[in-house]
Amino acid sequence: MYKNIDDIRQEFLNFFKKKGHKIISSSTLIPNSDQTLLFTNSGMNQFKNIFLGIDKPLFKRVATAQRCVRAGGKHNDLNNVGYTERHLTFFEMLGNFSFGDYFKNEAIQFAWELLTDVNWFNLSKNKLWVTVHNCDGESYDIWSNQIDIPNEHIVKIGSNTNDFCDSDNFWQMGNIGPCGPCSEIFYDRGDRFQGGPPGSLEEFGERYVEIWNLVFIQFDRQENGRLLSLPMLSVDTGMGLERITSILQGVNSNFSIDVFKKLISSISRIMKINDIYINRSVYVIADHIRACSFLIQDGVLPANEGRGYVLRRIIRRAILHGKKLGVNDIFFYKLVSPLIKYMQHIADILHEKKDFIAEILLSEEKLFQDTLKRGLELLEKQLIRLKGNCLNGEIAFNLYDTYGFPFELTQDVCLKRGIHVDQEGFDQAMLTQKKYTKELNKFDISYEKLSLCNVSSIFVGYDKLICKSRVMALFQNNKSINKIYTKEEGIVILNNTPFYGESGGQIGDCGQLNTISGFFQVSNTKKYGQTIGHLGIVNSGTISVGEEIVAQVDQHKRKCISLNHSATHLLRAALSQVLGSHVTQKGSLVNDRYLRFDFYHHATMTTTQMNTVENIVNEQIWKNAPITVDVMPIELARNSGAVILINKQYDKKVRVLKIGNFSTELCGGTHAEHTGEIGVFMITKECSIAAGIRRVEAVTNNVALSAIHQYKMLLKNIFQSTQSDDKNILSKIHEFKCRYQKLEKEIDTLRNQQIIQQSLSFIKDVYYIKDVRILVKQVVNMTSKTLFNMTDCIKHQLKSGVIVLINLNTNKKINLVVAVTKDLIERNRINALSLVHYIIKILGGKGGGRPDFAQAGINNMATTSKISIEVNSLLHNIL
């Protein structure tokens, strides 16, 4: 009986539900408790802390259908998608898990029953092969004696090296920690496919397909490589839904299963393509729209780093494959609707964000179109200057690295012109860049350490702004010292301090440190691991290690910072209300003068949206709501609904900041006690800082009041200057604008008349080389627009000929404009671009353009008369 993909998923879950398993929903594609992963890439990710012994399992038996993405980091299938029948960036992983309950025997029995029983998947037993680790005799015996699978269908896989764990049939989470042997189940697709059984020399063919991996977690690997037995034996299995669907539906490819067939059919209709099953670009697009839509749904937005960068790569890869299919119009966002239609089982998740997902994809596609246009223009300039038929790899890398222009597109453009691209040079430039980035990171780490980690500082500044302390260490120029003298700068480390160290976007405190022997002015405070460093200068006396000290924070500055920090939390919550739940923090700055908040959003905020956000924040301020802090375990905070930054590492216990019933977030910063202390909130700026990332700047309290006064004064000056008031200021500005535009038109008319007259006067200087009319003329201080208009006017008068205008600017820079009429180009006599290239070769400089019009800047500071002679000589040689 035919089963669609939804039937197969549900059948898997129903089977394990009958076997006493709790069915757990898929987690998001952003791992909540594992910052080492870019994306959720397997079913076990959400249970990792259980396997590590950090969390206790709520259920002993669990089964899931987990959404996964493998498009970055260790598990990256992105470049394989579309070129193999199996690889996908987005897929679902079916899995059953046991946490200290059943082990190998039951896991193998369950797998065999589901796969072969007539009431379930009903696969032929003769088609199934299994592999086991060659030292896992227990699994081998179960397969051989209890399942009664033929011994020739059981393959023992050894280690690749002398290391027992270095085997395809041994799973480990990392170099240390939980691990164990695994048993993989393969399906034989028949002799119409090439390839041999697993473990053979021909195993990499298409005939034998791995469909299920059963991992038996029984060891704890130590740093020295020893394997200790775990007290709790666990099972972790994974079976790709799309792959098992292809087997059960009797098709040869993941892209031929029901959900992909429907999606690909819609893609072909929307993109107006034929032969969809011949061109693999369609496979790429079908896979990528799934990955992109679910990533955006789970909170990932296009960016220049991290998860957002991977998403941007996937989007752009899909667009490039669209271009390979001859589709140059914007199309990708249109595929969201059919995707939702055909993925019914999770359509509800996507449907509520359908418009938002489409908007993000449309915005990113438009941005990439601009990138491609700019990149093609830059590439064209490089190809014009090219000597020979090989484009330097560094140039191709610069286009890729600086302008985001894809290397494969550079190759395509060059290939059409018979130009080779230096792949080796590109790869070398990429390697150099990676090494440079690595070195920068190394520098950051070494600076962070500063050997300060030997001293832990206790922060007491939540409750007090002045306290007694002791100098534990002093640093100068990254070196530990015992004393700092008058007018010397340094870093002071205390055993406890009221000074807040710069972190979480909040700047460090300022203030003073007083001892019997000296006075230290603190200009900034920074955190170095568990150490808090006070940066500043000794204003008088000396500061020595071991001295008792009185540490006093600048109270006014701290108060302003705290007000702005609380306002930032109100701003974030208000932005989420107005713009949508996708608003997540990308960065922030909180100081005593203003606050800055960077967040994911795809469009410029409208005036109405900004006013609404302002009003919401001010309403919360005027409520004078209490601001409270609770310290709790991270898991409890997560379950409470507190906003948690995905990419940030947190301690086991965290501070949860609650502002009335309006905002709940994790925060280690300092805050007001009530919102009323903030006084007033005003947005001063909203802008883009990167594709998909917006920035809002705002002020509060007295700074906001000062800003209002400044705006009032500015408005008063405008009224006086325009002789208007608040009732007619807009009409006055409109009147001035119309008058200005009218004068501009009159000036343009006069300028054009002058150009025509001057052009007519030039005609008398036309001369012939052979039968071609030539005009070479020197002009002074003309703008590019005037030069273009004059050239156009002379062309119109000449009808046929070559025009060269040599323009000398007041800064003594020379630029040329060359124009050639259409008839001469068609007769292959000459073209403007070739002429400019000849001139640049002799006189030096840079230039470019079209066959009918080109221009150049001349580096050589020769006189214009000399240039005229060279140009004339060139024309004689060419013609």
Curated annotation (Swiss-Prot):
Tell me the cofactors it needs.
Answer: Zn(2+)
Q: Which domain of life is it from?
A: Bacteria
| Disulfide bonds listed in the record | none
In terms of SUPFAM superfamilies, this protein maps to:
Class II aaRS and biotin synthetases (SSF55681), Putative anticodon-binding domain of alanyl-tRNA synthetase (AlaRS) (SSF101353), ThrRS/AlaRS common domain (SSF55186), Translation proteins (SSF50447)
Cross-referenced Pfam families, in alphabetical order? DHHA1 (PF02272), tRNA-synt_2c (PF01411), tRNA_SAD (PF07973)
Query: Which stretches are transmembrane?
Result: none
The biological process GO terms on file are: alanyl-tRNA aminoacylation; negative regulation of DNA-templated transcription
Compartment(s) of residence? Cytoplasm
Return the cofactor note field.
Answer: Binds 1 zinc ion per subunit.
| UniProt-annotated binding residues for Zn(2+) | 565, 569, 667, 671
Q: Does the keyword Transcription apply?
A: no
Q: What keywords sit in the KW lines?
A: Aminoacyl-tRNA synthetase, ATP-binding, Cytoplasm, Ligase, Metal-binding, Nucleotide-binding, Protein biosynthesis, RNA-binding, tRNA-binding, Zinc
The family annotation for this protein states: Belongs to the class-II aminoacyl-tRNA synthetase family.
The record's NCBIfam families line, in alphabetical order, gives: alaS (TIGR00344)
Entry function:
Catalyzes the attachment of alanine to tRNA(Ala) in a two-step reaction: alanine is first activated by ATP to form Ala-AMP and then transferred to the acceptor end of tRNA(Ala). Also edits incorrectly charged Ser-tRNA(Ala) and Gly-tRNA(Ala) via its editing domain.
What is recorded about the domains?
A: Consists of three domains; the N-terminal catalytic domain, the editing domain and the C-terminal C-Ala domain. The editing domain removes incorrectly charged amino acids, while the C-Ala domain, along with tRNA(Ala), serves as a bridge to cooperatively bring together the editing and aminoacylation centers thus stimulating deacylation of misacylated tRNAs.
Subunit: Homotetramer.
Name by which UniProt lists this protein? Alanine--tRNA ligase
